[in-house]
Amino acid sequence: MTQLPTAGPVIRRFDMSAQFTALYRISVALSQESNTARALAAILEVLHDHAFMQYGMVCLFDKERNALFVESLHGIDGERKKETRHVRYRMGEGVIGAVMSQRQALVLPRISDDQRFLDRLNIYDYSLPLIGVPIPGADNQPAGVLVAQPMALHEDRLAASTRFLEMVANLISQPLRSATPPESLPAQTPVRCSVPRQFGFEQMVGKSQAMRQTMDILRQVSKWDTTVLVRGESGTGKELIANAIHYNSPRAAAPFVKFNCAALPDNLLESELFGHEKGAFTGAIRTRKGRFELADGGTLFLDEIGESSASFQAKLLRILQEGEMERVGGDTTLKVDVRIIAATNRNLEEEVRAGNFREDLYYRLNVMPVSLPALRERLDDIADLAPFLVKKIALRQGRELRISDGAVRLLMTYSWPGNVRELENCLERASVMTDEGLIDRDVILFNHHESPALSVKPGLPLATDESWLDQELDERQRVIAALEKTGWVQAKAARLLGMTPRQIAYRIQIMDINMHRI
């Protein structure tokens, strides 16, 4: 690799001085290095050391295969780097494919908030931004895409960072126009759109008959462009289902856009859905695409459709019927090709009868209904679901975690009114209370409003005289009542409730019970 002039200590603030220094060193690399691969490696190193950018990557476009391949990558070495030779992105696929097809920069303020990010390299920090810019090429067709991740979250600097990367892309465009992929795959290698692992059908855990039937429907639905209405209680995983349908469908390489129908007042809905032209209203300083345009060619997920107003329903019905729309303040009719997946926890049939939901919109949406069973209807699935969720929590926390068989059996005694979301919250709460990496019964705490049917360990005696205990009390009140009954002696109260001392101590701490009464 070309040795670049020394420029003092690494710059840790991305300001004008850092930009000029980085651009100067990049120009030196391009002028001194005739080998394209080595020049790109030097440029990405400059972005890391002098522009506060990590995991820089250059993907080049292969016309024969109509796909992008990874030409240069900074931040990983050895075998992991060799594996990137087989990574490909189709036009419009993921962030990189979207930058290539749209021929414009794309900024994700946080990777975790954007479903287009595919994470095929498994190196990026989900809490930080990602910036992709097209590298100019011949015939108005980008030669490839330059991608980098800022090392810190400074949303006010994203625009400046994007402009800087666009300048870098322009600098490297000339040598890249004549570049050919040095290590391209054989011509017969297919370019395939892979499903992001977090959205695969393997995320739908359960062997119960209800889940098997749901999975059979999902696999069939994913093959076609049919409108889908996902129904189920809060916390059953409706958004997860929508993700799985999209990313296992023929539209997987296109955008997946989410919109919560209850999140905005009516006066903002039209602009959010259909976009607006510059000057359409006070504050419209630029033209803005709406959710339908952003989802063109892909899928639009309309969450909480049952909460929408009559005005919103009328606007939505028009575009579903005609496939056409105009931006607010515009007179040009735009055609959009969007698959609709809607979700609700309401009984829409009752809402239609009550006049709260348009009957014609109901029939437009209810082409292929998918009903998700409540967790209480498939308690046996917890045997597989709990370890699966514990593994996810362990990955987030960066440590080893296990769950005991006894804890799983205890979880299966609860009715889970909050469904899978409540189960995951319960397990994460338990994980915080264990230092040994084992989630056991004594750190399982259910929500206060409902206790499990069998919340005690086998062999521990329950109090036989329960005249002192109001069975309508929630769990916190039951613990306080037992403590008052026993003079605030924890060991005695634990025996009265059929708990271990550790269990009651844990509940006293979590439930914020004041022990200073004695």
Swiss-Prot record:
**Domain (GAF): residue spans on this chain:** 35-176
- Role played: Required for activation of most nif operons, which are directly involved in nitrogen fixation.
Location of region: Inter-domain linker: 433-475
One of the protein's GO biological processes: phosphorelay signal transduction system
The residues that make up the annotated DNA-binding region are 490-509
GO molecular function, a single term: ATP binding
Known SMART domains for this protein?
Answer: AAA (SM00382), GAF (SM00065)
Which parts of the sequence belong to the Sigma-54 factor interaction domain? 205-432
Q: Where is region (C-terminal DNA-binding domain) located? A: 476-518
Q: From the Swiss-Prot or TrEMBL record, give the protein name.
A: Nif-specific regulatory protein
Concerning SUPFAM superfamilies, the annotation shows:
GAF domain-like, Homeodomain-like, P-loop containing nucleoside triphosphate hydrolases
Q: How does it assemble?
A: Interacts with sigma-54.
Name of the gene encoding the protein in the UniProt record: nifA
